[in-house]
Design a protein with these regions (language model features):
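Short strand-turn-strand beta-turns centered on an Asx-Gly dipeptide
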Residues: 45-48, 147-149, 187
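Conserved alpha/beta catalytic core and glycan-binding cleft of carbohydrate-active enzymes
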Residues: 396-398, 416-560
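A structural motif
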Residues: 39, 141, 279, 396-397, ...
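Substrate-binding/active-site clefts of carbohydrate-active enzymes
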Residues: 202-206, 226-242, 248-428
Length: 560
Protein backbone atom coordinates (compact mmCIF):
# COMPACT_ATOMS: atom_id res chain seq x y z
CA UNK A 1 0.00 0.00 0.00
CA UNK A 2 1.57 3.29 -1.13
CA UNK A 3 1.10 6.11 1.43
CA UNK A 4 -1.04 9.05 0.33
CA UNK A 5 1.78 11.60 0.41
CA UNK A 6 3.94 9.41 -1.84
CA UNK A 7 1.01 9.03 -4.25
CA UNK A 8 0.74 12.82 -4.35
CA UNK A 9 4.45 13.10 -5.12
CA UNK A 10 4.31 10.48 -7.87
CA UNK A 11 1.36 12.31 -9.43
CA UNK A 12 3.33 15.58 -9.32
CA UNK A 13 0.70 17.10 -7.04
CA UNK A 14 2.54 17.32 -3.71
CA UNK A 15 2.70 20.83 -2.27
CA UNK A 16 5.78 20.11 -0.14
CA UNK A 17 8.14 17.53 -1.68
CA UNK A 18 10.55 17.96 1.23
CA UNK A 19 8.11 15.92 3.34
CA UNK A 20 8.76 12.88 1.14
CA UNK A 21 12.12 13.23 -0.59
CA UNK A 22 15.45 13.38 1.17
CA UNK A 23 16.27 11.89 4.55
CA UNK A 24 13.47 11.34 7.10
CA UNK A 25 13.12 9.66 10.49
CA UNK A 26 10.33 7.06 10.58
CA UNK A 27 9.76 4.45 13.29
CA UNK A 28 13.26 5.04 14.65
CA UNK A 29 14.76 4.42 11.22
CA UNK A 30 16.16 6.88 8.69
CA UNK A 31 14.57 6.60 5.25
CA UNK A 32 16.35 8.19 2.29
CA UNK A 33 14.24 8.70 -0.84
CA UNK A 34 15.11 9.74 -4.40
CA UNK A 35 12.84 10.31 -7.38
CA UNK A 36 14.65 9.86 -10.68
CA UNK A 37 13.10 8.93 -14.01
CA UNK A 38 14.83 7.15 -16.89
CA UNK A 39 17.19 5.21 -14.63
CA UNK A 40 17.52 1.46 -14.12
CA UNK A 41 19.38 1.50 -10.83
CA UNK A 42 20.05 3.94 -8.01
CA UNK A 43 22.65 3.86 -5.25
CA UNK A 44 23.74 5.96 -2.33
CA UNK A 45 27.44 6.28 -1.54
CA UNK A 46 28.37 6.92 2.10
CA UNK A 47 31.98 6.87 3.27
CA UNK A 48 32.94 5.24 -0.05
CA UNK A 49 30.43 2.45 0.57
CA UNK A 50 28.02 1.99 -2.39
CA UNK A 51 24.60 0.76 -1.31
CA UNK A 52 21.72 -0.09 -3.68
CA UNK A 53 18.41 1.70 -3.27
CA UNK A 54 15.11 -0.15 -3.63
CA UNK A 55 12.67 0.93 -6.33
CA UNK A 56 9.06 1.29 -5.26
CA UNK A 57 7.22 -1.11 -7.64
CA UNK A 58 6.07 0.43 -10.94
CA UNK A 59 7.44 3.86 -9.98
CA UNK A 60 10.58 5.96 -10.34
CA UNK A 61 10.89 6.41 -6.57
CA UNK A 62 13.86 4.80 -4.84
CA UNK A 63 14.47 4.45 -1.10
CA UNK A 64 16.84 2.91 1.40
CA UNK A 65 16.85 2.45 5.19
CA UNK A 66 19.85 3.90 7.04
CA UNK A 67 20.91 3.41 10.62
CA UNK A 68 21.67 7.06 11.30
CA UNK A 69 21.33 10.59 9.98
CA UNK A 70 23.99 11.82 7.56
CA UNK A 71 24.67 15.45 6.61
CA UNK A 72 24.22 16.13 2.92
CA UNK A 73 27.98 16.51 2.45
CA UNK A 74 28.54 12.91 3.54
CA UNK A 75 26.45 11.08 0.97
CA UNK A 76 25.90 11.24 -2.76
CA UNK A 77 23.53 9.52 -5.17
CA UNK A 78 24.66 7.46 -8.14
CA UNK A 79 22.32 6.34 -10.92
CA UNK A 80 22.60 4.11 -13.96
CA UNK A 81 20.41 5.34 -16.80
CA UNK A 82 18.83 3.46 -19.68
CA UNK A 83 21.96 4.03 -21.78
CA UNK A 84 24.13 2.47 -19.06
CA UNK A 85 25.67 5.82 -18.16
CA UNK A 86 26.56 6.51 -14.53
CA UNK A 87 25.99 9.90 -12.94
CA UNK A 88 26.58 11.22 -9.44
CA UNK A 89 24.81 14.10 -7.73
CA UNK A 90 23.94 15.45 -4.31
CA UNK A 91 20.47 15.38 -2.80
CA UNK A 92 18.50 18.62 -3.42
CA UNK A 93 16.06 17.72 -0.64
CA UNK A 94 18.41 17.73 2.33
CA UNK A 95 19.21 21.45 2.28
CA UNK A 96 17.74 24.04 4.61
CA UNK A 97 15.60 26.92 3.26
CA UNK A 98 17.70 29.71 1.77
CA UNK A 99 15.21 32.53 1.15
CA UNK A 100 15.52 35.24 3.80
CA UNK A 101 12.35 36.33 5.60
CA UNK A 102 13.36 39.97 5.07
CA UNK A 103 13.57 39.51 1.30
CA UNK A 104 10.17 37.82 1.16
CA UNK A 105 8.59 40.52 3.35
CA UNK A 106 9.99 43.42 1.32
CA UNK A 107 9.02 41.78 -1.96
CA UNK A 108 5.44 41.21 -0.79
CA UNK A 109 5.32 44.78 0.56
CA UNK A 110 6.35 46.32 -2.76
CA UNK A 111 9.52 47.72 -1.22
CA UNK A 112 12.21 45.36 -2.59
CA UNK A 113 13.87 47.37 -5.32
CA UNK A 114 16.65 44.87 -5.98
CA UNK A 115 14.57 41.69 -6.03
CA UNK A 116 16.59 40.37 -8.98
CA UNK A 117 19.45 39.76 -6.56
CA UNK A 118 17.55 36.90 -4.91
CA UNK A 119 14.79 35.97 -7.39
CA UNK A 120 15.33 33.95 -10.54
CA UNK A 121 18.24 31.56 -11.07
CA UNK A 122 21.77 32.17 -9.83
CA UNK A 123 24.90 30.23 -8.98
CA UNK A 124 24.98 29.36 -5.31
CA UNK A 125 27.00 27.31 -2.84
CA UNK A 126 25.56 25.66 0.25
CA UNK A 127 27.43 23.39 2.64
CA UNK A 128 30.44 23.70 0.29
CA UNK A 129 28.38 22.18 -2.53
CA UNK A 130 28.01 24.21 -5.73
CA UNK A 131 24.83 24.42 -7.74
CA UNK A 132 22.05 26.76 -8.82
CA UNK A 133 19.38 28.37 -6.64
CA UNK A 134 15.95 28.94 -8.24
CA UNK A 135 13.36 31.27 -6.69
CA UNK A 136 10.00 32.24 -8.24
CA UNK A 137 6.78 33.94 -7.12
CA UNK A 138 3.64 31.88 -7.85
CA UNK A 139 1.20 32.24 -4.92
CA UNK A 140 -1.72 30.46 -6.60
CA UNK A 141 0.22 27.31 -7.49
CA UNK A 142 -0.15 23.98 -5.74
CA UNK A 143 3.15 22.78 -7.16
CA UNK A 144 6.06 24.44 -8.99
CA UNK A 145 8.95 22.51 -10.52
CA UNK A 146 12.20 23.49 -12.20
CA UNK A 147 12.46 21.74 -15.57
CA UNK A 148 15.23 21.66 -18.13
CA UNK A 149 17.46 19.38 -20.14
CA UNK A 150 19.23 18.42 -16.91
CA UNK A 151 16.07 16.55 -15.79
CA UNK A 152 14.52 15.66 -19.18
CA UNK A 153 11.96 18.48 -18.71
CA UNK A 154 10.23 16.19 -16.21
CA UNK A 155 8.33 18.19 -13.60
CA UNK A 156 8.36 15.28 -11.14
CA UNK A 157 12.12 15.37 -10.58
CA UNK A 158 12.71 18.84 -9.11
CA UNK A 159 9.54 20.14 -7.39
CA UNK A 160 10.22 23.27 -5.35
CA UNK A 161 9.75 24.22 -1.69
CA UNK A 162 6.88 26.57 -0.83
CA UNK A 163 7.71 29.54 1.37
CA UNK A 164 4.15 29.66 2.67
CA UNK A 165 2.11 32.85 2.68
CA UNK A 166 4.69 34.80 0.66
CA UNK A 167 3.79 32.79 -2.43
CA UNK A 168 7.49 32.33 -3.20
CA UNK A 169 8.99 28.96 -4.14
CA UNK A 170 12.65 27.95 -3.97
CA UNK A 171 14.92 25.04 -4.77
CA UNK A 172 18.68 24.64 -4.64
CA UNK A 173 19.78 22.09 -7.24
CA UNK A 174 23.37 20.99 -6.62
CA UNK A 175 25.86 19.99 -9.28
CA UNK A 176 24.26 21.73 -12.29
CA UNK A 177 26.08 24.45 -14.18
CA UNK A 178 25.29 27.73 -15.86
CA UNK A 179 24.19 27.92 -19.47
CA UNK A 180 21.36 25.37 -19.25
CA UNK A 181 17.90 26.34 -20.58
CA UNK A 182 15.14 25.99 -17.99
CA UNK A 183 11.52 26.84 -17.26
CA UNK A 184 9.07 26.53 -14.41
CA UNK A 185 6.28 23.95 -14.58
CA UNK A 186 3.38 25.36 -12.60
CA UNK A 187 0.22 23.56 -11.46
CA UNK A 188 -2.68 25.83 -10.50
CA UNK A 189 -4.11 24.98 -7.09
CA UNK A 190 -7.76 25.33 -8.15
CA UNK A 191 -7.99 24.00 -11.70
CA UNK A 192 -5.00 21.67 -11.65
CA UNK A 193 -3.96 23.05 -15.04
CA UNK A 194 -0.24 22.85 -15.78
CA UNK A 195 1.72 25.50 -17.67
CA UNK A 196 5.36 25.95 -18.67
CA UNK A 197 6.67 29.44 -17.98
CA UNK A 198 9.91 31.29 -18.53
CA UNK A 199 11.46 32.86 -15.44
CA UNK A 200 10.15 36.44 -14.93
CA UNK A 201 13.54 37.33 -13.40
CA UNK A 202 15.66 35.53 -16.01
CA UNK A 203 18.82 37.43 -16.92
CA UNK A 204 19.31 35.54 -20.16
CA UNK A 205 16.96 33.77 -22.56
CA UNK A 206 17.10 31.54 -25.59
CA UNK A 207 17.19 32.96 -29.12
CA UNK A 208 13.68 33.29 -30.47
CA UNK A 209 11.53 31.40 -31.39
CA UNK A 210 12.79 29.29 -28.46
CA UNK A 211 11.40 30.63 -25.19
CA UNK A 212 13.29 29.06 -22.30
CA UNK A 213 15.30 31.02 -19.77
CA UNK A 214 19.02 30.34 -19.40
CA UNK A 215 20.89 29.87 -16.13
CA UNK A 216 23.16 32.94 -16.19
CA UNK A 217 26.89 32.94 -15.81
CA UNK A 218 28.18 34.33 -12.53
CA UNK A 219 31.05 36.11 -14.28
CA UNK A 220 31.00 39.84 -13.57
CA UNK A 221 31.81 42.26 -16.37
CA UNK A 222 34.92 44.38 -15.72
CA UNK A 223 33.78 47.95 -16.29
CA UNK A 224 36.11 50.71 -17.47
CA UNK A 225 33.68 53.67 -17.48
CA UNK A 226 34.47 55.05 -14.03
CA UNK A 227 35.31 58.52 -15.39
CA UNK A 228 32.00 58.72 -17.22
CA UNK A 229 29.97 57.66 -14.16
CA UNK A 230 31.79 60.18 -11.96
CA UNK A 231 31.13 62.94 -14.49
CA UNK A 232 27.49 61.93 -14.88
CA UNK A 233 26.85 62.30 -11.16
CA UNK A 234 27.53 66.03 -11.40
CA UNK A 235 25.99 66.52 -14.85
CA UNK A 236 23.67 69.54 -14.89
CA UNK A 237 21.28 68.13 -17.46
CA UNK A 238 18.84 71.04 -17.13
CA UNK A 239 21.41 73.53 -18.41
CA UNK A 240 23.73 71.44 -20.59
CA UNK A 241 23.30 70.31 -24.20
CA UNK A 242 21.39 67.06 -24.58
CA UNK A 243 21.10 65.70 -28.12
CA UNK A 244 19.76 62.16 -28.31
CA UNK A 245 19.98 59.72 -31.22
CA UNK A 246 17.08 57.24 -31.06
CA UNK A 247 17.88 53.89 -32.65
CA UNK A 248 16.52 50.40 -33.17
CA UNK A 249 19.32 47.85 -32.94
CA UNK A 250 17.48 45.40 -35.18
CA UNK A 251 17.37 47.71 -38.18
CA UNK A 252 20.12 50.31 -37.76
CA UNK A 253 22.63 48.09 -39.52
CA UNK A 254 22.84 44.40 -40.39
CA UNK A 255 25.45 41.94 -41.55
CA UNK A 256 25.90 41.27 -45.26
CA UNK A 257 23.82 38.09 -45.00
CA UNK A 258 20.95 40.01 -43.38
CA UNK A 259 21.54 38.67 -39.88
CA UNK A 260 21.73 40.85 -36.80
CA UNK A 261 25.00 42.36 -35.71
CA UNK A 262 26.05 41.74 -32.12
CA UNK A 263 26.06 44.35 -29.36
CA UNK A 264 29.85 44.51 -29.62
CA UNK A 265 29.85 44.94 -33.41
CA UNK A 266 27.19 47.65 -33.27
CA UNK A 267 29.08 49.55 -30.56
CA UNK A 268 32.28 49.71 -32.57
CA UNK A 269 30.47 50.83 -35.74
CA UNK A 270 28.20 53.27 -33.91
CA UNK A 271 30.73 55.37 -32.00
CA UNK A 272 32.40 57.14 -34.97
CA UNK A 273 28.99 57.80 -36.52
CA UNK A 274 27.57 59.35 -33.35
CA UNK A 275 30.72 61.38 -32.70
CA UNK A 276 30.67 62.74 -36.25
CA UNK A 277 27.04 63.86 -35.93
CA UNK A 278 27.60 65.45 -32.52
CA UNK A 279 25.03 63.56 -30.46
CA UNK A 280 25.59 63.35 -26.71
CA UNK A 281 23.48 60.22 -26.10
CA UNK A 282 21.86 57.30 -27.86
CA UNK A 283 18.44 56.00 -26.88
CA UNK A 284 17.72 52.36 -27.65
CA UNK A 285 14.29 51.09 -28.53
CA UNK A 286 13.58 48.27 -26.08
CA UNK A 287 16.16 45.49 -25.98
CA UNK A 288 14.48 43.77 -23.05
CA UNK A 289 13.70 40.32 -24.46
CA UNK A 290 10.65 40.12 -26.71
CA UNK A 291 9.28 37.33 -28.93
CA UNK A 292 7.87 39.26 -31.91
CA UNK A 293 10.23 41.22 -34.14
CA UNK A 294 7.40 43.36 -35.46
CA UNK A 295 6.77 44.83 -32.01
CA UNK A 296 10.18 46.63 -32.17
CA UNK A 297 10.68 45.43 -28.59
CA UNK A 298 7.58 47.01 -27.07
CA UNK A 299 5.98 43.67 -26.16
CA UNK A 300 8.38 42.54 -23.47
CA UNK A 301 8.62 39.05 -22.01
CA UNK A 302 12.04 39.32 -20.34
CA UNK A 303 12.24 42.38 -18.10
CA UNK A 304 15.76 41.47 -16.94
CA UNK A 305 17.14 39.95 -20.16
CA UNK A 306 18.98 41.79 -22.94
CA UNK A 307 17.62 40.40 -26.20
CA UNK A 308 19.48 37.32 -27.37
CA UNK A 309 19.16 38.59 -30.95
CA UNK A 310 22.29 40.65 -30.42
CA UNK A 311 24.25 38.61 -27.89
CA UNK A 312 24.40 37.88 -24.18
CA UNK A 313 24.40 40.18 -21.11
CA UNK A 314 28.19 40.43 -21.19
CA UNK A 315 28.00 41.71 -24.78
CA UNK A 316 25.43 44.36 -23.86
CA UNK A 317 27.58 45.50 -20.94
CA UNK A 318 30.43 45.92 -23.44
CA UNK A 319 28.13 48.02 -25.67
CA UNK A 320 27.35 50.47 -22.86
CA UNK A 321 30.91 50.51 -21.56
CA UNK A 322 32.37 51.16 -25.00
CA UNK A 323 30.05 54.10 -25.62
CA UNK A 324 30.77 55.53 -22.16
CA UNK A 325 34.50 55.34 -22.78
CA UNK A 326 33.90 57.51 -25.85
CA UNK A 327 31.79 60.03 -23.90
CA UNK A 328 28.44 58.89 -25.27
CA UNK A 329 25.55 58.27 -22.88
CA UNK A 330 23.05 55.44 -23.25
CA UNK A 331 19.32 55.59 -22.53
CA UNK A 332 16.91 52.67 -22.80
CA UNK A 333 13.25 52.63 -23.76
CA UNK A 334 11.56 50.73 -20.91
CA UNK A 335 8.00 49.37 -21.05
CA UNK A 336 6.14 49.05 -17.71
CA UNK A 337 2.71 49.87 -19.18
CA UNK A 338 1.78 46.52 -20.71
CA UNK A 339 3.04 43.09 -21.71
CA UNK A 340 2.06 40.47 -24.33
CA UNK A 341 -0.30 37.52 -23.94
CA UNK A 342 2.27 34.90 -24.98
CA UNK A 343 1.62 31.65 -23.11
CA UNK A 344 5.25 31.14 -22.10
CA UNK A 345 5.63 34.48 -20.29
CA UNK A 346 3.88 36.57 -17.62
CA UNK A 347 0.27 36.16 -18.76
CA UNK A 348 -1.82 33.93 -16.47
CA UNK A 349 1.48 33.02 -14.82
CA UNK A 350 0.30 30.69 -12.06
CA UNK A 351 -3.08 29.95 -13.61
CA UNK A 352 -4.45 33.30 -12.49
CA UNK A 353 -4.04 36.93 -13.45
CA UNK A 354 -0.96 37.34 -11.29
CA UNK A 355 0.87 40.15 -13.08
CA UNK A 356 -2.22 41.51 -14.84
CA UNK A 357 -5.77 42.43 -13.82
CA UNK A 358 -8.13 39.53 -14.47
CA UNK A 359 -10.94 42.03 -15.15
CA UNK A 360 -10.60 42.88 -18.90
CA UNK A 361 -11.96 46.38 -18.22
CA UNK A 362 -8.81 46.97 -16.19
CA UNK A 363 -6.35 44.43 -17.53
CA UNK A 364 -6.33 44.57 -21.31
CA UNK A 365 -5.24 47.03 -24.00
CA UNK A 366 -7.61 46.36 -26.88
CA UNK A 367 -5.63 48.53 -29.31
CA UNK A 368 -2.37 46.70 -28.72
CA UNK A 369 -3.69 43.25 -27.85
CA UNK A 370 -1.65 43.28 -24.65
CA UNK A 371 -2.22 43.03 -20.90
CA UNK A 372 -1.93 45.78 -18.29
CA UNK A 373 0.08 45.34 -15.10
CA UNK A 374 -1.91 45.27 -11.88
CA UNK A 375 -0.27 48.25 -10.18
CA UNK A 376 -2.40 47.71 -7.09
CA UNK A 377 -0.49 44.53 -6.30
CA UNK A 378 2.58 45.39 -4.25
CA UNK A 379 4.67 42.58 -5.67
CA UNK A 380 4.30 44.21 -9.10
CA UNK A 381 5.94 47.32 -7.65
CA UNK A 382 8.88 45.20 -6.50
CA UNK A 383 9.08 43.44 -9.87
CA UNK A 384 8.97 46.52 -12.10
CA UNK A 385 11.10 48.83 -9.96
CA UNK A 386 13.67 46.05 -9.62
CA UNK A 387 13.69 45.80 -13.42
CA UNK A 388 14.27 49.53 -13.83
CA UNK A 389 17.06 49.63 -11.25
CA UNK A 390 18.58 46.46 -12.70
CA UNK A 391 19.33 48.24 -15.97
CA UNK A 392 20.67 51.30 -14.16
CA UNK A 393 22.76 49.27 -11.72
CA UNK A 394 24.02 46.28 -13.65
CA UNK A 395 24.43 47.93 -17.07
CA UNK A 396 25.31 51.50 -16.01
CA UNK A 397 22.57 53.01 -18.18
CA UNK A 398 22.22 56.77 -17.97
CA UNK A 399 18.46 56.81 -17.83
CA UNK A 400 15.19 55.28 -18.94
CA UNK A 401 12.57 56.58 -21.32
CA UNK A 402 9.34 55.22 -19.84
CA UNK A 403 7.00 54.22 -22.64
CA UNK A 404 3.24 54.87 -22.87
CA UNK A 405 2.87 56.72 -19.57
CA UNK A 406 -0.49 58.16 -20.63
CA UNK A 407 -1.92 54.65 -20.95
CA UNK A 408 -0.87 54.00 -17.36
CA UNK A 409 -2.34 57.21 -15.95
CA UNK A 410 -5.86 56.98 -17.38
CA UNK A 411 -8.31 54.15 -16.76
CA UNK A 412 -10.26 55.17 -19.87
CA UNK A 413 -7.22 55.42 -22.14
CA UNK A 414 -8.36 54.51 -25.67
CA UNK A 415 -11.64 53.13 -24.31
CA UNK A 416 -15.25 53.97 -25.07
CA UNK A 417 -17.96 54.47 -22.47
CA UNK A 418 -18.72 51.20 -20.70
CA UNK A 419 -15.29 49.76 -21.46
CA UNK A 420 -13.53 50.96 -18.30
CA UNK A 421 -14.01 51.11 -14.54
CA UNK A 422 -13.68 54.36 -12.59
CA UNK A 423 -11.46 54.67 -9.53
CA UNK A 424 -12.81 54.75 -5.97
CA UNK A 425 -13.61 58.45 -6.35
CA UNK A 426 -15.44 57.95 -9.63
CA UNK A 427 -12.65 59.46 -11.75
CA UNK A 428 -10.63 58.17 -14.68
CA UNK A 429 -7.23 58.50 -13.03
CA UNK A 430 -5.38 55.26 -12.31
CA UNK A 431 -4.43 56.06 -8.72
CA UNK A 432 -2.46 52.84 -8.28
CA UNK A 433 -0.37 53.58 -11.37
CA UNK A 434 0.31 57.11 -10.11
CA UNK A 435 1.57 55.68 -6.81
CA UNK A 436 3.79 53.23 -8.67
CA UNK A 437 5.25 55.89 -11.00
CA UNK A 438 6.12 58.17 -8.10
CA UNK A 439 7.75 55.33 -6.19
CA UNK A 440 9.70 54.30 -9.29
CA UNK A 441 11.10 57.78 -9.88
CA UNK A 442 11.94 58.35 -6.23
CA UNK A 443 13.84 55.05 -6.12
CA UNK A 444 15.80 55.81 -9.30
CA UNK A 445 16.71 59.40 -8.41
CA UNK A 446 17.77 58.51 -4.87
CA UNK A 447 20.13 55.76 -5.99
CA UNK A 448 21.47 57.01 -9.33
CA UNK A 449 22.16 60.74 -9.28
CA UNK A 450 22.57 62.06 -12.79
CA UNK A 451 20.49 59.31 -14.38
CA UNK A 452 17.41 60.63 -16.16
CA UNK A 453 13.85 59.33 -16.03
CA UNK A 454 11.98 60.50 -19.12
CA UNK A 455 8.26 60.16 -19.74
CA UNK A 456 6.57 59.54 -23.05
CA UNK A 457 3.34 61.20 -21.93
CA UNK A 458 0.99 62.53 -24.60
CA UNK A 459 -1.69 64.29 -22.52
CA UNK A 460 -1.88 67.39 -20.36
CA UNK A 461 -1.43 65.57 -17.05
CA UNK A 462 0.07 68.24 -14.76
CA UNK A 463 3.54 68.21 -13.19
CA UNK A 464 4.86 65.13 -14.97
CA UNK A 465 8.45 66.36 -14.57
CA UNK A 466 8.00 67.97 -11.15
CA UNK A 467 9.31 66.40 -7.93
CA UNK A 468 6.95 64.12 -6.04
CA UNK A 469 7.19 66.31 -2.94
CA UNK A 470 5.60 69.08 -5.00
CA UNK A 471 2.79 66.83 -6.17
CA UNK A 472 4.48 65.77 -9.40
CA UNK A 473 5.12 62.37 -10.91
CA UNK A 474 8.85 62.75 -10.35
CA UNK A 475 10.19 62.35 -13.90
CA UNK A 476 13.28 64.29 -14.90
CA UNK A 477 11.88 65.25 -18.29
CA UNK A 478 8.87 64.74 -20.52
CA UNK A 479 8.66 64.19 -24.26
CA UNK A 480 6.81 67.10 -25.86
CA UNK A 481 4.51 65.10 -28.11
CA UNK A 482 2.30 68.11 -28.81
CA UNK A 483 5.21 70.14 -30.18
CA UNK A 484 6.22 67.25 -32.42
CA UNK A 485 2.75 66.70 -33.87
CA UNK A 486 2.07 70.41 -34.44
CA UNK A 487 5.48 71.13 -35.92
CA UNK A 488 5.42 68.19 -38.33
CA UNK A 489 1.93 69.12 -39.50
CA UNK A 490 3.08 72.69 -40.12
CA UNK A 491 6.29 71.73 -41.91
CA UNK A 492 4.49 69.25 -44.17
CA UNK A 493 2.32 72.06 -45.56
CA UNK A 494 3.18 73.83 -48.78
CA UNK A 495 4.67 77.23 -47.79
CA UNK A 496 1.75 78.92 -49.57
CA UNK A 497 -0.63 77.62 -46.90
CA UNK A 498 1.57 77.97 -43.82
CA UNK A 499 0.45 81.54 -43.15
CA UNK A 500 -2.94 80.17 -42.12
CA UNK A 501 -1.49 77.73 -39.60
CA UNK A 502 0.94 79.74 -37.49
CA UNK A 503 -0.96 78.55 -34.41
CA UNK A 504 0.86 75.24 -34.91
CA UNK A 505 4.06 77.10 -34.05
CA UNK A 506 2.85 79.45 -31.35
CA UNK A 507 0.76 77.04 -29.29
CA UNK A 508 3.74 75.06 -27.99
CA UNK A 509 5.23 78.26 -26.55
CA UNK A 510 2.15 78.73 -24.39
CA UNK A 511 3.12 75.72 -22.27
CA UNK A 512 6.85 75.42 -23.02
CA UNK A 513 7.89 76.22 -19.44
CA UNK A 514 5.32 74.08 -17.59
CA UNK A 515 7.54 70.98 -17.80
CA UNK A 516 11.16 70.01 -18.43
CA UNK A 517 10.54 69.13 -22.05
CA UNK A 518 12.51 67.06 -24.53
CA UNK A 519 11.67 67.92 -28.13
CA UNK A 520 11.38 64.57 -29.95
CA UNK A 521 11.23 63.45 -33.54
CA UNK A 522 10.02 59.99 -32.65
CA UNK A 523 10.17 56.63 -34.38
CA UNK A 524 6.36 56.65 -34.24
CA UNK A 525 6.32 59.44 -36.83
CA UNK A 526 8.22 57.54 -39.51
CA UNK A 527 6.45 54.15 -39.41
CA UNK A 528 3.24 52.67 -40.84
CA UNK A 529 3.64 54.55 -44.14
CA UNK A 530 3.94 57.92 -42.40
CA UNK A 531 7.04 58.63 -44.51
CA UNK A 532 10.53 59.63 -43.46
CA UNK A 533 11.16 63.15 -42.25
CA UNK A 534 12.42 64.26 -45.63
CA UNK A 535 9.47 62.49 -47.24
CA UNK A 536 7.10 64.64 -45.20
CA UNK A 537 8.58 67.87 -46.54
CA UNK A 538 6.89 69.65 -49.46
CA UNK A 539 8.43 70.54 -52.81
CA UNK A 540 11.10 69.03 -55.03
CA UNK A 541 14.25 67.39 -53.71
CA UNK A 542 16.12 70.66 -53.13
CA UNK A 543 13.10 72.18 -51.36
CA UNK A 544 12.63 69.06 -49.22
CA UNK A 545 16.20 69.29 -47.98
CA UNK A 546 15.87 73.02 -47.36
CA UNK A 547 12.69 72.48 -45.35
CA UNK A 548 14.31 69.68 -43.37
CA UNK A 549 17.26 71.93 -42.51
CA UNK A 550 14.76 74.55 -41.38
CA UNK A 551 12.96 71.98 -39.21
CA UNK A 552 16.20 70.99 -37.47
CA UNK A 553 17.22 74.61 -36.95
CA UNK A 554 13.81 75.44 -35.52
CA UNK A 555 13.97 72.42 -33.23
CA UNK A 556 17.41 73.24 -31.82
CA UNK A 557 16.60 76.92 -31.25
CA UNK A 558 13.15 76.37 -29.72
CA UNK A 559 12.92 78.10 -26.30
CA UNK A 560 12.23 75.83 -23.36
Amino acid sequence: MIPADIKQLLAAKHHDPFQVLGLHLKDEKWILRLFKSRVKEAYVIINEQRMPMKRLPATDLFEIELTQHYPVQEYIFETLNDDNQLSRFHDPYCFSPILKDEDAYLFNSGEHFYAYKFMGARSYSQNDINGVLFIVWAPNASRVSVVGGFNYWDGRIHPMRSNGASGIWELFIPDIETGHPYKYEIRNRDSGDISLKMDPFARETEYRPATASIIPSSDDYKWADQKWIAKRTDFDWLHQPLSIYEMHLGSCQKAEDGSYLSYTQIAEKLVPYIKKLGYTHVQLLPITEFPYDGSWGYQVTGYFSPSKRFGNPHDFAYFVDYLHQHDIGVFLDWVPAHFPKDDHALANFDGTGLYEHEDPLLGEHKDWGTLIFNYGRKEIHSFLISSALYWLEEFHLDGLRVDAVASMLYLDYSREAGEWRPNKYGGNENLEAVEFIRKLNEAAHARYPGALMMAEESTSWPRVSHPTYLGGLGFSMKWNMGWMNDTLKFMSLDPIFRQYHHDKLTFALMYAFTENFILPLSHDEVVHLKKSLIGKMPGDQWQKFANLRLLYAYMFTQPG
